[in-house]
Amino acid sequence: MGISELEYLPQTTVNALLQYDNVRLATFRGYEYATDQWKKYLSDTKFFKVGEVDQIQCVFCRMKTSIRNEERIKKHVADCREGVVSAPQQQPPPPPSTSIGAVGGDPRPEDMNVPERGWDPPMSKDPKSTFLGKWPHSEYISIDSMVAEGFEFIGPGDRVQCRHCKVILRNWETTDIPSSEHERNAPRCPLVVQRYLTRMREDDERRDRELKEVQQRRKMDMNKAFSQDMSKLENRIASLKFWPGPIRDIEKVARTGFFYTGEKDMLTCYACACKLINWEKNDDPIKEHKINFPHCANMADVKWSDVGFSNDEECVICLGAKADTILKPCLHYSLCYGCSTQVQKCPLCRKKIEKRVQTTNVLQ
């Protein structure tokens, strides 16, 4: 169970769940920037992960800090009185006493201040026998559903008590559901908490199974596509159906010679085996291919003027030769190759020159 699941639960239930070490540890699931040992230490010392990127919070005093601030965390563990006092406890503290509500309407917890007991049922007698011949609502609330919630009939009237948390409910109505009333009135009951944990674990397992099935189907489909000859346009298009890149015109990408091999957003050209990664929405696959791998046979028919680089402009430095060199990464096209080798920064934007591509098909 992670933060996303806790967001949909009542706050009283969230507070109760966070008293459990395994629940706090589960809030760190999916956070990749801390070791498992550090996550275990944080959960053991009563911290849990909150929604902010690197933020954790103390379950007792609610102090927030960065998961990376090791010095402050360890100082807080030593200083937080609630954490020090409560650290030896294995179970959350008993729920506070509750006041009896008005007679009638929803079931109400009795005004009791009885500490929670352990998980093992404390009573040896058959709880079902306490209802037989006494439960006044058997026509619309079955005895079995009450027993399943840990209730025993204590009377008078329709009063029942949970064997685990000792909450007492009464004034049942025809539309009441025992499990819902139990969760609403006693969210910290071990039986209720265990049901939440089981439900979340089952949801996680179901999602994991579904994700693995999707990944397996995707892998099988991609392997089928990769087994084909990528010189064929239709096979490249088939592989690009799985590509997570931002360019939606996959046919244009395929016609440029690229196909997808399943690694991040990297594309590979079938003709020159070049690989390009970190694609952006406005990238032109033909232009990127021509600039980065101008010698590719698949780019032989693509002219530099077709991708926005014309040699009609003069070099801005010597003012004699024609501009014929693309500067990377800024892609400005204002220098002849000779002048470009004499400068370290682009004269237009002042960015450092990392690579020079001469449009007369001399790759530098």
Curated annotation (Swiss-Prot):
Region of interest called Disordered, as start-end residue ranges on this chain: 83-126
Keywords: Metal-binding, Repeat, Zinc, Zinc-finger
Bias-annotated ranges (Basic and acidic residues): 117-126
CDD domains: BIR
One annotated GO molecular function: zinc ion binding
BIR repeats: 24-89, 127-193, 236-300
Alphabetical list of Gene3D superfamilies matching this protein: Inhibitor Of Apoptosis Protein (2mihbC-IAP-1), Chain A, Zinc/RING finger domain, C3HC4 (zinc finger)
InterPro entries hit by this protein: BIR_rpt, IAP, Znf_RING, Znf_RING/FYVE/PHD
One Pfam family in the UniProt entry: BIR
Function: May act as an apoptosis inhibitor.
Name used for this protein in its record: Putative apoptosis inhibitor ORF42
Lineage, top ranks: Viruses, Duplodnaviria, Heunggongvirae, Peploviricota, Herviviricetes
